[in-house]
């Protein structure tokens, strides 16, 4: 595609998902002090009668969901918070034993369990203890397979029609703070925020600092054929931070993405942006160990307690207990899920899920209450951020067919006005199925008070600058700061100053711009755009409907197309190889965009583009005598149409940006660009067609792959190479997902091409199995990028003198080519999650190795924040 297609990127999409994760990391870093270390317990569990080790016994902190299990040799490691004084060891056929623990940070224990006189009787199930675990002839595995076989009839999707009232509450804050931390000078004005915290056992946990709460009340309708769910939001409220500093909508969307709905009947459960294998997935016996640990005859029907543990504690798997009904339905009555301490998961110190099911009028089980607790921390020690999402389901009814009009439109619809004042505390007190805890009740008031304190405003201002790169200045923001200074061979030392308006100036009009100056070429550059929303919403709120006009004069490297990254970013100033072929661009552009609730959108554009070669880039053509004729500028007028369809797409929505959330659904796009000769000074006729698709493929425990497939065709004759498809190259040392990292700028040009890009993330599936290495929590990543194209003779300077000559180096050798008989291919193997945020790839170029000054291999680095 032409080299300027992504030149007019606004800065609204720079950070997106990373911004929300960054906000979380800032709070974690702020709280990271040594005000309470975890207790590390190590020990062995044995049979008191024969001193034989007891494998897969449960070791749990009393009054907590923190638990572990012994290995084949009876050994265990358990990490608990310092306030707990007892642990409980239990195993089927033995009497449970409570052990008191001291305050030492590291403790070793030897525990002897006493066999029960009468082992637990089960209903048609016995659970003899085996020396070594095996799926064969294992009653626990036979039981879980019966649960798997009955999944479809027990899940809510099996109902023809169902409807219920749903209440959601998300709350979080700093937890387990010490008295010393609370009394620090920096918190002198914030004492009203701290709450005394206790656990069920009565042991003091110090102080908590509640920081966020959100509530939502909805009516939900589901039907089986055709499958459809409709959520009508009846009321919602949350603690609001100053919108100058915090994007409340984006923060809410991010927390709701982390604290997702938990469906135990799904094969893969998405949590904290990762997919965990459900203990009742079809493949669960391959990845989990199951044990029958109890029967419960005090409930009707009788229940079996089925304990399960990951075979590999580093994999993305749960551990916990399932309570299965013994009425022939094999439904889940209750479920308690957590994760192992050794799991390859970033920033999550503890994860706890509790699911409770109730029977409906037909004696079938539906989810009654779901609780998800997450404890985030930068390290295993110290305080983190602890949050809980509680969801209750009431007034559950089935068999009531609603008209099609109920299911029409978007799957989630707000039934309340944005500033509805009728949803006051009296309303919530009446409609909440669960009363707020005292510390939760105070959050709404405390956040309002907190924002009146000048020191807190300064802290938020600095945090916003660090995370977004912009400095607040009334109704505008100055930035991004990482573009203030950069350098390149053409401009030399480059200074830039820019900014953008916010919704404090206008919710419908948005402007951004910058000016820059190069001290070597002594030229001014600038960019200015104005966007007006046509649907009385922010221009970045779905569905978008706006008109935008922009003007730009700036430099550009042909073949460097950076999505969502400023090209004068300081870090991108460092490049390998020759890097002196630039363009001066003057672009005037008008755009009209319309999105629909179906996630279909179109973008219409009209642009006038004048480009002048800069540096050592030349535009030259051979005349009839074979002499070079130089061209000092090139002009075109383009009309463009872009179509995009992204079914079931969701966004991290912010004030000045939005970013799509990856899911399993494909994204299709089609772009058409027409060059208009003799229109507004346009000099060429051509038609550029691009068709492509993006999709993420999930492979459960084997990770996931992001795949892009694209085809391009340019129709026209005697088209100079700047208007052909100059393929994306990368001469920086940063690994770029959408570019060819070992291809030089301007190296390959085509007028028809097909390409494929595969990024495969294994989430540590291999490295998690290697002793010692798995302690590093590194993860594997592989990629293959291939592109094949051709260049028709009428557009190839080797066959016609009516187009610009390809570029040559100082020795007169060509450095720009069409493709030969094979595609260009590069592949990489790398490690990600190094220090939790660094990706390093070894990239190898597989062909076209004889072309001058091309790298055959290299190391590339990328920053990637992820859980």
Place the predicted regions along the sequence by residue:
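Structured extracytoplasmic
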Residues: 129-303, 309-317, 379-486, 579, ...
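A short, solvent-exposed beta-strand micro-motif common in secreted/extracellular proteins
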Residues: 83-93
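Short Pro-Gly-centered beta-turn/loop motif in secreted/extracellular proteins
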Residues: 51-55, 77-84
């Amino acid at each position: 595609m032409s080299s300027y297609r992504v030149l007019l990127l606004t800065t609204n999409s720079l950070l997106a998902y990373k911004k929300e994760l960054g906000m979380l990391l800032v709070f974690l870093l702020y709280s990271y002090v040594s005000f309470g270390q975890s207790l590390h317990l190590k020990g062995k569990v044995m049979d008191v009668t024969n001193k034989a080790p007891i494998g897969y016994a449960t070791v749990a902190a009393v009054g907590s969901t923190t638990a572990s299990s012994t290995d084949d040799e009876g050994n265990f490691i358990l990490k608990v918070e310092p306030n707990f004084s007892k642990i409980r060891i239990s195993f089927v056929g033995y009497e449970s034993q409570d052990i008191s623990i001291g305050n030492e940070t590291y403790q070793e224990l030897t525990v002897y369990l006493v066999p029960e006189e009468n082992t637990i009787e089960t209903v048609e199930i016995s659970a003899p203890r085996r020396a070594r675990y095996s799926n064969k002839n294992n009653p626990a595995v036979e039981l879980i397979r019966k649960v798997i076989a009955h999944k479809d009839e027990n899940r809510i999707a099996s109902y023809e029609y169902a409807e219920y009232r749903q209440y959601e509450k998300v709350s979080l804050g700093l937890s387990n703070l010490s008295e010393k931390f609370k009394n620090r000078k920096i918190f002198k004005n914030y004492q009203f925020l701290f709450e005394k915290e206790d656990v069920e056992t009565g042991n003091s946990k110090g102080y908590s600092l509640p920081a966020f709460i959100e509530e939502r009340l909805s009516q939900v309708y589901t039907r089986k054929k055709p499958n459809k769910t409709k959520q009508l939001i009846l009321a919602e409220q949350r603690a609001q931070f100053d919108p100058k500093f915090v994007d409340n909508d984006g923060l809410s969307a991010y927390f709701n993405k982390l604290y997702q709905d938990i469906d135990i009947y799904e094969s893969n459960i998405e949590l904290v942006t990762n997919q965990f294998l459900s203990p009742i997935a079809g493949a669960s016996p391959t990845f989990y160990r199951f044990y029958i640990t109890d029967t419960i005859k005090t409930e009707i029907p009788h229940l079996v307690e089925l304990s399960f543990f990951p075979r590999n504690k580093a994999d993305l798997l749960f551990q916990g207990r399932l309570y299965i009904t013994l009425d022939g339905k094999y439904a889940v009555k209750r479920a308690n899920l957590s994760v192992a301490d050794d799991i390859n998961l970033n920033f999550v110190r503890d994860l706890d899920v509790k699911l409770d099911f109730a029977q409906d009028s037909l004696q079938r089980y539906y989810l009654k209450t779901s609780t998800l607790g997450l404890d985030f921390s930068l390290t295993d020690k110290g305080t983190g951020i602890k949050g809980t999402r509680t969801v209750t389901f009431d007034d559950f009814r089935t068999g009531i067919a609603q008209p099609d009009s109920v299911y029409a439109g978007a799957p989630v619809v707000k039934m309340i006005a944005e500033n509805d004042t009728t949803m006051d505390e009296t309303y919530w007190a009446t409609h909440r199925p669960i009363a707020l805890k005292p510390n939760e009740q105070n959050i709404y008031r405390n956040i309002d008070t907190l924002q009146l304190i000048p020191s807190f405003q300064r802290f938020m201002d600095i945090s916003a600058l660090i995370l977004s790169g912009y400095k607040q200045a009334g109704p505008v923001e100055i930035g991004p700061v990482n573009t203030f200074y950069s350098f390149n061979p053409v401009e030399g030392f480059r200074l830039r100053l820019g900014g953008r308006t916010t919704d404090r100036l206008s919710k419908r009009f948005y402007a951004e711009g910058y000016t820059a100056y190069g001290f070597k070429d002594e030229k001014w550059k600038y960019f200015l755009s104005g966007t007006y929303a046509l649907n009385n919403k922010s221009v970045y709120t779905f569905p978008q409907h706006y008109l935008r006009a922009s003007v730009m004069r700036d430099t550009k490297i042909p073949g460097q197309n950076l999505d969502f990254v400023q090209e004068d970013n300081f870090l991108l100033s460092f490049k390998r190889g020759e890097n002196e072929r630039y363009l001066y661009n003057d672009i005037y552009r008008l755009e009209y965009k319309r999105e629909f609730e179906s996630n279909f959108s179109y973008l219409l554009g009209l642009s006038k583009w004048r480009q002048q070669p800069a540096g050592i880039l030349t535009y030259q053509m051979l005349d009839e005598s074979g002499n070079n004729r130089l061209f000092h500028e090139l002009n075109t007028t383009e009309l463009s149409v872009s179509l995009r369809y992204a079914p079931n797409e969701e966004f991290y929505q912010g004030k000045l940006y939005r970013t799509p959330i990856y899911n399993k659904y494909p994204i299709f796009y089609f772009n058409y660009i027409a060059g208009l000769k003799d229109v507004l000074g346009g000099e060429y006729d051509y038609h550029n067609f691009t068709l492509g698709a993006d999709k993420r493929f999930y492979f459960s425990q084997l990770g996931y792959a992001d795949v892009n497939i694209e085809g391009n065709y340019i129709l026209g004759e005697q088209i100079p190479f700047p208007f052909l498809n100059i393929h994306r190259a990368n001469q920086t040392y940063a690994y770029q997902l959408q570019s060819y990292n070992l291809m030089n700028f301007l190296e390959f040009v085509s007028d028809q091409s097909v390409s494929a890009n595969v990024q495969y993330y294994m989430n540590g599936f291999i490295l998690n199995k290697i002793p010692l290495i798995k302690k590093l929590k590194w993860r594997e990543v592989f990629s293959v990028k291939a592109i094949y194209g051709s260049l028709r003779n009428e557009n190839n300077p080797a066959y016609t003198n009516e187009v610009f000559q390809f570029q040559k180096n100082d020795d007169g050798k060509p450095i720009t080519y069409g493709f030969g008989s094979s595609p260009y291919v590069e592949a990489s193997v790398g490690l990600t999650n190094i220090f939790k945020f660094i990706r390093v790839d070894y990239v190898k170029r597989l062909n076209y190795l004889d072309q001058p000054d091309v790298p055959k291999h290299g190391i590339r680095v990328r920053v990637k924040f992820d859980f």
